[in-house]
């Protein structure tokens, strides 16, 4: 009986090792094909799809390699082309190479599905619930990186940006977020290795990046796909409805000036630099006299009743004192 048990364990170990080697070869083939171009990548994906390949990610998730002809795909080609046009700063073609799925017992279709794309410039994205998430700047880094679906690496469609402020405005911003997440992931792994070999070490603090990585790992250990927006505070703080409900933004936050007034209009003196307001600039000294409002006209304007608000789509512009215009977003 003992001999049979040892033989079974040895066979299972050999099978696991063979599966691991085959996975590494398939992942290497995908990485090489992605470097050669989109035609080579599509050919490699179709070849693996015919084999029914399911490759294991370093996080523990299994990626089903497939193209848009996949039987259980929950989006069509028109949706993919729509994402290519409505999710700036993305301005490239999306090449599908796999999905990460969650199945319930006896379900006809997947209960949740992450669709994986790569662009001709090697950027890897995941699509979930109408939003694109930047995962890695290359195919090789994707297979060893963290699967995090947060506000910082999200690309919201332009139709949604009237309700939420985008964090990343360029692809460089997304790459910077990836490197920050990768750094925190390496620190966590090094701390775990040190804890197993020597005295126990503790983290100085747990920031939002670490919290998102730990929550993603916990969900994967439970056999689930990482959830979106673990850090709800960042998403809520950049919701335009929340900003309007909490009132005006503080004057010491220059990054939030766009939310208090349109960029084409002058800002109030209280929101500008106090030193600049106290010291007259050269441009102000050279202002022609015709641009100065006479005192009689100014008193006439101040005594006149306020103008009614003008509604333009979902933005209300209300005339205030002087030339200052306040923007109110209606959600």
Curated annotation (Swiss-Prot):
Keywords: Host cytoplasm, Host nucleus, Host-virus interaction, Modulation of host cell apoptosis by virus. One of its GO terms (biological process) is symbiont-mediated perturbation of host apoptosis. It is found in: Host cytoplasm; Host nucleus. It comes from the Viruses. It holds the Pfam family US22. GO terms for cellular component: host cell cytoplasm; host cell nucleus. Residues 275-304 have a biased composition (Low complexity). Its main location: host cell. The keyword Signal does not apply. Plays a role in the inhibition of host apoptosis to facilitate efficient viral replication. Promotes stabilization and inactivation of host TP53 through interaction with host MDM2. Induces host mTORC1 activation by antagonizing the ability of host TSC1/2 to negatively regulate mTORC1. Thus, inhibits a growth regulatory pathway to facilitate viral replication. Prevents premature cell host cell death by blocking host ubiquitin-specific protease 24/USP24-mediated autophagic ferritin degradation in lysosomes thus maintaining lysosome integrity and cellular viability. Belongs to the beta-herpesvirinae UL38 protein family. Interacts with host MDM2; this interaction leads to the stabilization of host TP53. Interacts with host TSC2; this interaction prevents host cell stress responses. This is Apoptosis inhibitor UL38.
């Amino acid at each position: 009986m003992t001999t049979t048990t040892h033989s079974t364990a040895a066979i299972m170990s050999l099978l696991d090792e063979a599966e691991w080697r085959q996975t590494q070869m398939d992942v290497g083939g995908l990485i090489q094909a992605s470097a050669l171009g989109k035609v080579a990548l599509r050919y490699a994906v179709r070849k693996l799809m015919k084999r029914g390949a399911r490759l294991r990610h370093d996080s523990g998730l299994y990626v089903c390699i497939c193209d848009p002809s996949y039987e259980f795909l929950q989006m069509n080609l028109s949706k993919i082309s729509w994402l290519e046009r409505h999710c700036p700063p993305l301005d490239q073609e999306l090449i599908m190479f796999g999905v990460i799925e969650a199945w319930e017992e006896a379900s006809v279709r997947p209960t949740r599905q992450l669709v994986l794309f790569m662009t001709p410039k090697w950027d890897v994205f995941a699509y979930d619930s109408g939003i694109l998430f930047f995962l890695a700047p290359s195919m090789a880094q994707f297979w060893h990186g963290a699967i995090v679906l947060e506000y910082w690496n999200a690309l919201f469609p332009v139709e949604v940006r009237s309700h939420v402020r985008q964090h990343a405005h360029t692809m460089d911003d997304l790459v910077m977020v990836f490197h920050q997440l990768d750094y925190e992931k390496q620190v966590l792994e090094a701390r775990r290795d040190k804890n197993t070999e020597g005295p126990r070490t503790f983290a100085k603090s747990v920031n939002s990046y670490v919290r998102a990585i730990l929550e993603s790992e916990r969900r994967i250990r439970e056999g689930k796909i990482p959830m979106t927006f673990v850090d709800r505070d960042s998403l809520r703080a950049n919701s335009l409805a929340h900003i309007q409900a909490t009132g005006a933004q503080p004057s010491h936050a220059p990054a939030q000036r766009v939310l208090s007034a349109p960029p084409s209009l002058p800002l109030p003196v209280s929101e500008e630099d106090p030193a600049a307001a106290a010291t007259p600039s050269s441009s102000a000294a050279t202002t022609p006299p015709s641009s100065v409002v006479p005192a009689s006209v100014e008193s006439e304007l101040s005594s006149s009743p306020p103008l009614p608000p003008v509604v333009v789509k979902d933005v209300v512009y209300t005339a205030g004192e002087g030339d200052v215009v306040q923007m109110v977003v209606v959600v």
